[in-house]
Each structure stands twice: as structure tokens, then as C-alpha cells.
Amino acid sequence: MQEIELLPSSEQDNRYIHQQLRQYNRQFMRDFKDYSFHIKQDGQIVAGIVAASTMDTLEVEFLFVEESCRGQGLGRLLLEQAENLARQDGCKRVLLNTYSFQAPGFYRRMGYELLAQQNPCFGEYSQYYFTKNL
């Protein structure tokens, strides 16, 4: 029997695992396309979105705006860019999830509909699952 080791993962390990999962999923979920973008200000990344589509659905994995840059429309700009490009490529909907300490109100203002809410999820926090038709 081969020896196995159970080890904590580094960021590099996590990237490899994520890459392998995406590669595996592509066998079943065709037309995979990345819609990830970032915004730089004075040479520093201050906002970014990590999103990808498969078949006719765009999934937003992460949307982040530096605290000092919030309220300037950067999140809206990133989300609309991903939505518009995905729509042009034939996507029909967007899926995402967020937590009560993040931005559920932002997604509602952006036209997202609540699919499900888990209360509580992590301690006192709730988790929200949203969708939007494109």
C-alpha cells in the first residue's frame, strides 16, 4: 500500500486543486469561459471579480472592493462588465452567494433575486443565494 500524507494546503496547492477541479468539470459542463477582471488605482489592485460561465450560466465566485474604494461604483462596474460579456456570449442567468456581513443589499440593488437564505450559517451570519436573469 502506498503511503499517503494529509497536509495543510498552501495558496499554490489551492490553485492547483481549483485548476484540477475545473479541468474535471469541463468534461461535463461545456463552454467554460472565464470572466475575471480587476481594477487598478495608482498601480495597485483595488477591486476584482472572479467569475466563469459554463453552458448558459455565469457564476460569480468572488467580488471584492477595497474598503477605502467602496461607494465609488467599482463593484457595479465589475459586475456589469461580467454580466454584459456573458450575455453577449449567450448566458441566460447569473448565480452567486454572499453573506450578511458582505453585500446582500448591493446584489438586490443590482437586480438579483434571492433564491435561498440560510440562517444562521456561520455563527450569527446568514448566507444568501442569488440569481439574476440576463
Language model features: what each stretch is:
Residues 17, 107, 112:
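Conserved active-site tyrosine of GNAT-family acetyltransferases
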Residues 78, 102-103:
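Conserved short alpha-helix immediately C-terminal to the canonical SAM/SAH-binding motif I
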